[in-house]
A protein has these predicted regions:
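Structural recognition of the beta-strand scaffold that forms the well-ordered cores
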Residues: 60-63, 95-96
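A short secondary-structure junction signal
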Residues: 33-34, 62-63, 72-75, 108-109
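Metal-dependent phosphoester-hydrolase catalytic domains
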Residues: 50, 82-95, 100-160
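Charged helix-capping and loop-helix junction motifs
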Residues: 76-81
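Structured beta-strand-rich core segments of catalytic domains in phosphoester-bond hydrolases
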Residues: 1-60, 150, 156-159
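Acidic/histidine-rich helix-loop elements
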Residues: 38-41, 67, 133
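Short aromatic-enriched loop/helix-cap "lid" or pocket-rim segments at secondary-structure transitions
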Residues: 17-20, 44, 74-75, 106-110
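Short, glycine/acidic-enriched loop or turn micro-motifs at the edges of active sites
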Residues: 66-68, 102
Length: 160
């Protein structure tokens, strides 16, 4: 189903590991996983891929899972913004998605102001989607931010 994928391993345990993944129908031409951990007990990464979409061109896709504490998230947002400013050409199409653990809705204002990103569910429905816990979502922790193109439909996946 997904001929292209990138996986950035962020933490390794005796019983397995965890990280971020990007799945694509289109060729992933490059990828890099950056350590954005805010402290040693909570390993976090920023997975950055460049995807080549036939007839459209290249798009930068970033996947994150931010810290549980607000101070850590703030530092991680700073790292994400620095990465985008350094590597992604100004105004170039971009998707930034993942678990932002953004209980207070602070990331969106910062990402809009500094990178020109909009959140797809906020644009469509007026607020981010409920996505956690998966079985009965009540919290709005996951986000999809974009720039450089229009999103016509977005939904929370409820399958397994």
């Amino acid at each position: 189903v997904w001929p292209e994928f990138a996986y950035g391993r962020n933490a390794v345990y005796d019983h397995g590991h965890h990280g971020n993944a990007i799945l694509s129908r289109f060729p992933i031409v490059s990828w890099e996983n950056l350590d954005v951990s805010s402290h040693i007990l909570e390993r976090r990464g920023l997975l950055h891929c460049e995807v080549d979409i036939p007839g459209f061109g290249r798009i930068h896709c970033l996947c994150v899972h931010l810290a549980l504490d607000e101070r850590g998230r703030s530092r991680q947002l700073h790292q994400i913004i620095e990465r985008v400013v350094e590597v992604v050409p100004d105004g170039h199409p971009l998707i930034l998605a993942g678990d932002f653990n953004d209980w207070r809705n602070r990331a969106g204002r910062r990402l809009a102001g500094e990178l020109g990103l909009t959140e797809v569910f906020r644009d469509d429905r007026g607020r981010p989607a409920r996505s956690f816990p998966a079985g009965f979502p009540i919290f709005r922790l996951d986000r999809i931010y974009v720039r450089g193109f229009s999103v016509y439909h977005a939904e929370v996946h409820h399958g397994h």
